[in-house]
Design a protein with these regions (language model features):
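C-terminal motif of bacterial Sec signal peptides marking the signal peptidase cleavage site
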Residues: 17-21
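Short non-domain terminal segments
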Residues: 4-5, 16, 29
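Core hydrophobic alpha-helical transmembrane segments of single-pass membrane proteins
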Residues: 11-14
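Bacterial N-terminal signal peptides that target proteins for export
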Residues: 1-9
Length: 146
């Protein structure tokens, strides 16, 4: 009986430690069998932006980001002004920072990279945060797969 209780308590401690260490993202799943890279590699569609806690109106704007397994990235911004639709495409690379807490995007030919703190990362949803160093403004972006 004492051995059973001991092993039950030990199993609970090990499981709690294991499950609590599986996610580094505040809003993410606590356990997944998919690697962070396999969750990040996807076709992402920006569904919402909040800036300093206020939701921004995204009507007439569409941002699509494709992150490939080889580290390449393509961002496609579509927007409509006075009934005319425009599209801008930027190519570059993506990577995680050393502890995989941030997504780092670098446009081809750019000298500066954009860093986004990852708040949530599942196979279907990603939430990132970026702080503008010059203004201190905080933007939270929510992405879903298409």
């Amino acid at each position: 009986m004492k051995k059973t209780i001991f092993f039950s308590v030990l199993s609970l401690i090990v499981a709690t430690t294991f499950l609590s260490s599986c996610s580094k993202y505040d809003e993410g799943s606590k356990f997944t069998l998919l690697t962070k890279k396999s969750r990040m590699v996807n076709n992402w569609h920006l569904t919402s932006i909040t800036q300093d806690g206020l939701a921004l109106n995204m009507s007439g704007i569409s941002l699509h980001m494709e992150l490939m397994k080889d580290g390449s990235a393509t961002n496609t911004l579509s927007y409509t002004v006075l009934g005319q639709t425009f599209e801008d495409v930027a190519v570059g690379t993506w990577e995680f920072n050393d502890d995989k807490s941030k997504l780092v995007l670098t446009e081809t030919g750019a000298t500066i990279s954009d860093e986004y703190t990852i708040l949530k990362l599942t196979k279907d949803e990603m939430k990132t945060e970026q702080i503008d160093p010059s203004t201190g403004s905080v933007s939270v972006n929510t992405w879903n797969t298409k």
